[in-house]
Curated annotation (Swiss-Prot):
GO terms for molecular function: 4 iron, 4 sulfur cluster binding; 4-hydroxy-3-methylbut-2-enyl diphosphate reductase activity; metal ion binding. This is 4-hydroxy-3-methylbut-2-enyl diphosphate reductase. It catalyses: isopentenyl diphosphate + 2 oxidized [2Fe-2S]-[ferredoxin] + H2O = (2E)-4-hydroxy-3-methylbut-2-enyl diphosphate + 2 reduced [2Fe-2S]-[ferredoxin] + 2 H(+); dimethylallyl diphosphate + 2 oxidized [2Fe-2S]-[ferredoxin] + H2O = (2E)-4-hydroxy-3-methylbut-2-enyl diphosphate + 2 reduced [2Fe-2S]-[ferredoxin] + 2 H(+). It comes from Trichormus variabilis (strain ATCC 29413 / PCC 7937). The gene is ispH. [4Fe-4S] cluster binds at residues 66, 157, 288. Belongs to the IspH family. Binds 1 [4Fe-4S] cluster per subunit. Its EC number is 1.17.7.4. It is an enzyme of class 1 (oxidoreductase). InterPro entries: LytB/IspH. Pathway: Isoprenoid biosynthesis; dimethylallyl diphosphate biosynthesis; dimethylallyl diphosphate from (2E)-4-hydroxy-3-methylbutenyl diphosphate: step 1/1; Isoprenoid biosynthesis; isopentenyl diphosphate biosynthesis via DXP pathway; isopentenyl diphosphate from 1-deoxy-D-xylulose 5-phosphate: step 6/6. (2E)-4-hydroxy-3-methylbut-2-enyl diphosphate binds at residues 96, 185, 250, 317-319, 379. The active site is at 187 (proton donor). Its cofactor is [4Fe-4S] cluster.
Length: 402
C-alpha cells in the first residue's frame, strides 16, 4: 500500500476530522473542572515547593499533561458533545491514564474489544464515530475504518505524525527504519505500519547487537529469532541493514535515542566511509519536546536532597516508566503509582517496578521531617497529582499526632 497517498486521501475525506468541532471553549471549562488543581498551581507559584508539617514537597518543573495529551482529551470531549446520540469508539485507550479512560467510559465512549490479542472491529457500525488516540493507529486500522464509512476523529499527537513522516522518508530512500521503541506499544505499532522495512530495538544493548551484525556478521538465524516480533515481514538482516534510518517511539529516553542514533552513524561510517555515509544512513530529530522537558526536569530534581520519589502515571505509560528509571538510576527510593489508592498507609504502598511487577513495600514513608520529590507522566492530570500529595500530607499529619 502507498501509505502516504492513503493518508493524504483520508485526510481530505468528509468523514475525517483532526481539528475539532468548534466546542473548544466549552470543553476547556469542563476539562479545567475535572483535571486541573488549585493546589498544584499553588506549588508552581511557590517555586515548585510546598511545606506542611514534617513534609516538604518538591515538584519537578515539567510534569503532567503535555500539549498533545490535552489536545487528544479535549477532542474526545468535543466529539461526544458534537455527536450526543451516536455510538462512539476509541481504537485504544485515549491516553495511558486510568482515570481519564474511566471518564471516557462514563461518557459512553466504547473501547474496541480485544480477543486473543486482536482487536474486534466487527462491533463498529458503518455510521459510528471512531476516535484515534493520541499515539495514533496503524494504517491497516485506518483503512478498515475508512472502508466501513465511519466518521474518524484523529487525535494523533503531531509529534507522532512527525515520526510517521520520517519513516516515510526512509522508505522513499530505500532505507530500513530502525525504530527505538517497544514493539508491543501502540505508537510503535502505528509507526512501523507506515514504514517499509523496519527493525525495532528496545535499548542500546539491542542496538549494539545490530551494529555488531552490520560490521562483523553473526548467526543469521539467531538474529531473526531475537527480533522475530520486532521486524517487518521477510526481513533479511544481510540485505536490509545496508541502508538504515533512525526513528523512535516519542516516549523513550531522549539520551538513549541519541546514543542509538550516534551508534548507527558511527557504524555506517566505519563500514562505508565518509563519502558514502549519507547513502547508507539517515537521521532526523524526532525526539518529542514534552518528553525531553519532563526527563530533563526529572534529572534536575533527583540531584536535590530527597528522601524519596513518587512517580505518578499509568502503569502502561512508557514516558512515566522512563521517569521512574531516571530516579532509580540515581539510587533514590522511588515508587511508581497510577492512582492515590496505591498508597495504603504510612507503612504500605503498592507500586510498579521497572520489570512490570506490582509489589507492596512496607515502611516506605520515613519518620520525622522528609523531602518528597514528585513528578508525573505526560498523561497524568494535575488532579491525580494533588490527590497523592494530599494523601502524603494527611498520613504524616496523623503519625505526628500519634
Amino acid at each position: 500500500m502507498d501509505t502516504k497517498t492513503f493518508k493524504r486521501t483520508l485526510q481530505h475525506s468528509e468523514n475525517y476530522n483532526r481539528k475539532g468541532f468548534g466546542h473548544q471553549a466549552e470543553v476547556a471549562t469542563q476539562l479545567q473542572s475535572e483535571y486541573q488543581s488549585s493546589l498544584i498551581q499553588e506549588i508552581r507559584d511557590r517555586n515548585y515547593t510546598l511545606q506542611r508539617g514534617d513534609v516538604t514537597i518538591r515538584l519537578a518543573q515539567a510534569f503532567g499533561f503535555c500539549w498533545g495529551v490535552e489536545r487528544a482529551v479535549a477532542m474526545a470531549y468535543e466529539t461526544r458533545k458534537h455527536f450526543p446520540t451516536e455510538r462512539i469508539w476509541i481504537t485504544n485507550e485515549i491516553i495511558h491514564n486510568p482515570s481519564v479512560n474511566q471518564r471516557m467510559q462514563e461518557m459512553q465512549v466504547g473501547f474496541i474489544p480485544v480477543e486473543a490479542g486482536n482487536k474486534d472491529f466487527s462491533v463498529v457500525g458503518n455510521n459510528d464515530v471512531v476516535i484515534l488516540p493520541a499515539f495514533g493507529a496503524s494504517v491497516q486500522e485506518m483503512q478498515l475504518l475508512s472502508e466501513k464509512g465511519c466518521k474518524i476523529v484523529d487525535t494523533t499527537c503531531p509529534w507522532v505524525s512527525k515520526v510517521w513522516n520520517t519513516v516515510e522518508k526512509h522508505k522513499k530512500g530505500d532505507h530500513t527504519s530502525i525504530i527505538h521503541g517497544k514493539y508491543k506499544h501502540e505508537e510503535t505499532i502505528a509507526t512501523s505500519s507506515f514504514a517499509g522495512k523496519y527493525l525495532i530495538v528496545l535499548n542500546l544493548k539491542e542496538a549494539q547487537y545490530v551494529a555488531d551484525y552490520i560490521l562483523h556478521g553473526r548467526n543469521r538465524e539467531e538474529f531473526l529469532q531475537k527480533f522475530a516480533k520486532a521486524c517487518s515481514a521477510g526481513f533479511d538482516p544481510d540485505k536490509d541493514l545496508e541502508r538504515v534510518g533512525i526513528a523512535n517511539q516519542t516516549t523513550m529516553l531522549k539520551g538513549e535515542t541519541e546514543q542509538i542514533g550516534k551508534l548507527f552513524e558511527h557504524t555506517m561510517l566505519q563500514k562505508y566511509g565518509p563519502v558514502e555515509l549519507n547513502q547508507h544512513f539517515q537521521s532526523f530529530n524526532t525526539i518529542c519536546d514534552a518528553t525531553q522537558e519532563r526527563q530533563d526536569a526529572m534529572l534536575e530534581l533527583v540531584q536535590e536532597n530527597l528522601d524519596l520519589m513518587i512517580v505518578i502515571g499509568g502503569f502502561n505509560s512508557s514516558n512515566t516508566t522512563q521517569l521512574q528509571q531516571i530516579s532509580q538510576e540515581r539510587g533514590l527510593p522511588s515508587y511508581h503509582i497510577d492512582v492515590v489508592e496505591r498508597i495504603k498507609s504510612v507503612n504500605s504502598i503498592e507500586h510498579r517496578q521497572l520489570n512490570g511487577e506490582l509489589v507492596t513495600t512496607e515502611n516506605w514513608l520515613p519518620a520525622g521531617k522528609i523531602v518528597v520529590g514528585v513528578t508525573s507522566g505526560a498523561s497524568t492530570p494535575d488532579k491525580v497529582v494533588e490527590d497523592v500529595i494530599e494523601k502524603i500530607f494527611a498520613l504524616k499529619a496523623t503519625t505526628a499526632v500519634v
